[in-house]
A protein has these predicted regions:
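N-terminal accessory segment detector
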Residues: 1-141
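Short, hydrophobic/π-rich interface segment
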Residues: 140-191
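A beta-hairpin/wing motif
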Residues: 191-199
């Protein structure tokens, strides 16, 4: 395992921080809507905003980042599941929040399919890079196809008695927000094989 911080480690941390932003926005909206007390919602949010090199255990970089991913994934699942319990209609509000957080990170409007795929991979939490979750199948100038080789998200949701389909709905809207500045969209028929192409 690496004993030195590299750009890929900062990328992983950046993806985690972006998901932290989504959690914070959901908690903020939930408090404003009166869905829960702000003090209770705070338990799902992290106040850590220091740069990676100021907080990471450099003697265990891989382990520290893996734990950080698990933590942010678990808190998102727990928060959303709690808010939707008995109130499935709230999902539409959360989906719109996910879209807006994604839109704030909008991809370059002139990017091609391959560039957009790479952009998405630097913004979406998908386990550690060594997990190799997304495997390219083929690519053209205007199309990028890949397969998801492992499901690294669902267990966080089932552990809190939530629905993995809720996560997929939020992720889909988040991705749509990122791509909102482009002519592209991501589609899938089975949740395993994906295609990024012009709408």
């Amino acid at each position: 395992m690496s004993m030195f911080l590299a750009p890929i480690h900062f990328m992983v941390y950046g993806k985690n921080q972006l998901q932290e932003q989504l959690i914070a926005e959901i908690a903020k909206r939930a408090a404003a809507e009166g869905w829960a007390e702000a003090s209770a919602l705070d338990a799902y949010c992290s106040r850590e905003d220091r740069p990676l090199d100021a907080i990471i255990d450099v003697s265990n970089i891989h382990g520290w980042l893996s734990k950080s991913i698990a933590d942010v994934e678990h808190r998102l699942a727990a928060l959303v599941t709690e808010l939707l319990f008995g109130h499935p209609e709230r999902l539409a509000v959360l989906e719109e929040l996910a879209y807006e957080v994604g839109r704030e990170q909008a991809a370059p409007a002139d990017a091609g399919a391959g560039e957009l795929f790479q952009y998405l991979t630097t913004h979406l939490v998908d386990g550690m890079p060594c997990d190799g979750v997304n495997m390219m199948r083929d690519q053209t100038a205007e199309t990028f196809r890949w397969d998801k080789t492992a499901d690294v998200h669902s267990h966080y949701w089932t552990e809190v008695e939530g629905s993995p389909t809720v996560y997929q709905a939020l992720r889909s809207r988040f991705v749509a927000g990122i791509l909102s500045s482009t002519d592209y969209e991501v589609s899938t028929a089975d949740g395993i094989s994906f295609v990024l192409q012009k709408a």
